[in-house]
Design a protein with these regions (language model features):
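HIT superfamily nucleotide-processing domains
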Residues: 1-93, 97-139
Length: 139
């Protein structure tokens, strides 16, 4: 499928900050300072499930999940990573990668619906994004 027909779902646009593109996926930061929380969104029109990607794209997505997860873990020094493709509210395929700490407000439960989203401090989120870009794209 052509990437040119692809566009980011409106809810994802509203709830995230775009930090760049990997070969398959757009990398986004969720606008919630409670958790270091990233999304990978494969730029494939009509992809709802991972099985909607062909085998090469599925392998590329796993490579990107590993790359971004490793960067997030190194930057945050988190206790646990949560990685999930749920899509119950947004039908566009996207993968959540969330750095969790045993001290966070939702631990050990899932993060959804536990706390009202907290806006990021502008300086802190830019520092975080810069660190992510260095780790993800420069290794």
């Amino acid at each position: 499928m052509s990437e040119s027909a692809w566009s980011l779902h409106s809810r994802l646009k509203e709830d995230t900050i775009d930090i760049g593109d990997l070969p398959l996926s757009k990398v986004l930061v969720i606008k919630d300072a409670h958790y270091p929380w990233l999304l990978l969104v494969p730029r494939r029109p009509d992809a709802v499930e991972i099985i909607d990607l062909d085998e090469v794209e599925q392998a590329q997505l796993m490579t990107e999940i590993s790359r971004v997860s490793r960067a997030l873990k190194e930057i945050t020094k988190c206790d646990k990573l949560n990685v999930a493709a749920l899509g119950n509210l947004v039908p566009q395929l996207h993968v959540h990668i969330i750095a969790r700490r045993t001290s966070d407000a939702a631990w050990p439960r899932p993060v959804w619906g536990v706390m009202k989203p907290l806006a990021h401090d502008a300086t802190e989120v830019q520092t975080f994004i810069s660190a992510l870009r260095r780790k993800i794209w420069l290794g």
